[in-house]
UniProtKB/Swiss-Prot annotation:
An individual GO BP term: glutamyl-tRNA aminoacylation
PROSITE patterns in the cross-refs: AA_TRNA_LIGASE_I
Organism per entry: Sphingopyxis alaskensis (strain DSM 13593 / LMG 18877 / RB2256)
Motif ('KMSKS' region): 254-258
EC number from the UniProt entry: 6.1.1.17
Name of the featured protein: Glutamate--tRNA ligase 1
Subunit relationships: Monomer.
Summary of the function given for this chain in its UniProt record: Catalyzes the attachment of glutamate to tRNA(Glu) in a two-step reaction: glutamate is first activated by ATP to form Glu-AMP and then transferred to the acceptor end of tRNA(Glu).
Lineage of origin: Bacteria, Pseudomonadati, Pseudomonadota, Alphaproteobacteria, Sphingomonadales
């Protein structure tokens, strides 16, 4: 690229539209798929699906010391859980190292790169000099304009970056951002052992994969200018850039583990969120469509664009995520929820659920899910259905039983025993409980609380009529009989 270039804007090539759109998600497998990465993947996926284009997945595993198979599995598992399907085969960057080196040598032959023989000591001296002058350290290699080095001697390949003029990126999120070429350095393309650097690999892979839109976190904005210098040196098509602000914690600081910067698997397993809730929340975390909060997948694909991605960092709010999850729990299919909740219940009650148990759990969902915010809350609320005999009673429930009016549970049990299996229905159960409350001259709540404690061992449960119906006549009467033997003041 000619050094006398004036300022150039990085949208010289027409922006791809429709089926020509190609986006990519390119995580490094050095850890889990964190929540910020999941949002980046979602935005790329939605943009591609909105345009009817392609969404590609590339695993940037060039850091061999830190890349692990477990991390790769976690990333792929997280993507599948979020239902962010990708087109074609997964690309593994390390396997393409020969192609990356080929481009570097091609650039060397064309004069766009040069061999640099600076030693580590020389680089350290240059760095110390920059620090002493309180200047940013940028490599200005004396080998840029020399060709008398020995190709057999240890060296790196550096990009011959432009030194004059400026570059402006017309970023779809950040707007126009300009950097003087003098602020850029001749970064390394190939290390002394011949391995390619991240900066080279990313540019080559994006070009070869046909990526038209690079949508990523704004912590990569500075890299874009260096990558653009390489793209122009190769005379390749320039992608459209969209650098999305990072997610911050509720206190406005960079998102960390204490804020919720956990792996996607933690939101699924430990916290019990549904993928549609996480997707909806991440979509609204930095992008908006008027006042719409609940956005279906079909609506998200139809509405998503880059014009409505905000420039300011979004703040992660667990309460909003929980509220969204509660909505999606209420909307979810009961059999699906039962399948998701069953393993949690098995862990809580210490036994496997058989088919009859799972059928009961599905039947109970309508009563369990209205007030729940997570799968864990549903599981906790359902344990009374599968409690062992004798049923555990928590401290608060024991206090309720101990303070119940003498004879109240016995009278209630006797009245319920008068209902046979054919009359163990919601209507008849409600009538019986209300009749006993009236006979005891108590409000319904005063009777329902000890009844709930006796039947569930807890003070919080689904409605008492639902509890009686779900437990059935035999179990309900057995638990009521057992509860009458709790010692006073227990």
């Amino acid at each position: 690229m000619a050094t006398e270039n004036p300022t150039r804007v990085a949208t010289a090539t027409p922006e791809a539209t429709g089926a020509d759109v190609v986006t990519r998600f390119a995580p490094s497998p050095t850890g889990y798929l964190h929540i910020g990465g999941a949002r980046t993947a979602l935005f790329n996926w939605l943009f591609a699906r909105h345009h009817g284009g392609k969404f590609l997945l590339r695993i940037e595993d060039t850091d061999r010391a830190r890349s692990t198979d477990a991390a790769i599995d976690a990333i792929l598992d997280g993507m599948r859980w979020l239902e962010l399907d990708w087109d074609g085969e997964t690309v593994f960057q390390f396997a393409r190292a020969p192609r990356h080196a080929e481009v570097a040598h091609d650039l060397l032959a064309r004069g766009g790169a040069y061999r640099c023989y600076l030693t580590q000591d020389e680089l350290a001296a240059m760095r110390a000099e920059a620090q002493e002058k309180r200047q940013p350290f940028r490599v200005r290699s004396p080998w840029r304009d020399r060709d008398d080095g020995d190709p057999a001697a240890p060296h790196v390949l550096r990009l011959r970056a432009p030194q004059d003029g400026a570059v402006t990126i017309a970023d779809k999120v950040q707007g126009e951002v300009t950097v003087q070429n003098a602020e850029l350095d001749d970064f390394i393309l190939l290390r002394s052992d011949g391995t390619p650097t991240y900066m080279l690999s990313v540019v080559v892979d994006d070009n070869d994969m046909g990526v038209t839109h690079v949508i990523r976190g704004d912590d990569h904005l500075n890299n874009a200018f260096r990558q653009l210098a390489l793209i122009r040196a190769m005379d390749w098509r320039e992608p459209v850039y969209a650098h999305v602000p990072l997610i911050h914690g509720a206190d406005g600081t960079k998102l960390s583990k204490r804020h919720g910067a956990l792996g996607v698997d933690a939101y699924r397993d430990a916290m019990g969120y549904l993928p549609e809730a996480v997707n909806n929340y991440l979509l609204r975390l930095g992008w908006g469509h008027g006042d719409d909060e609940i956005i279906s997948r079909a609506q998200a694909i139809e509405w998503f664009d880059l014009d409505h991605v905000g420039r300011s960092p979004s703040r992660f709010d667990f309460k909003k995520l929980e509220n969204l999850n509660g909505h999606y729990l209420r909307e979810a299919d009961d059999a699906r929820l039962a399948g998701l909740v069953a393993p949690r219940i098995e862990a809580l009650v210490g036994r496997a659920l058989d088919n009859a148990d799972r059928d009961l759990l599905t039947q109970a969902m309508a009563a369990l899910k209205p007030r729940a915010k997570t799968l864990g809350e549903i599981a906790e609320g359902a344990t009374f259905l599968f409690a062992p005999d004798p049923m555990p009673v928590d401290e608060k429930a024991a206090e309720v039983l101990a303070s119940a009016p003498e004879g109240l549970l016995a009278a209630m049990t006797q009245r319920l025993r008068g209902l046979d299996d054919d009359h163990w229905t919601s209507e008849d159960l409600e009538a019986a409980v209300r009749a006993e409350a009236e006979a005891a001259e108590l409000g319904l709540g005063k009777l329902a609380q000890p009844l709930r404690a006796a039947l569930t061992g807890r003070t919080v449960s689904p409605g008492i009529f639902d509890v009686l119906l779900l437990l059935g006549r035999k179990v309900s009467l057995a638990r009521l009989d057992a509860a009458q033997h709790y010692p006073a003041g227990a």
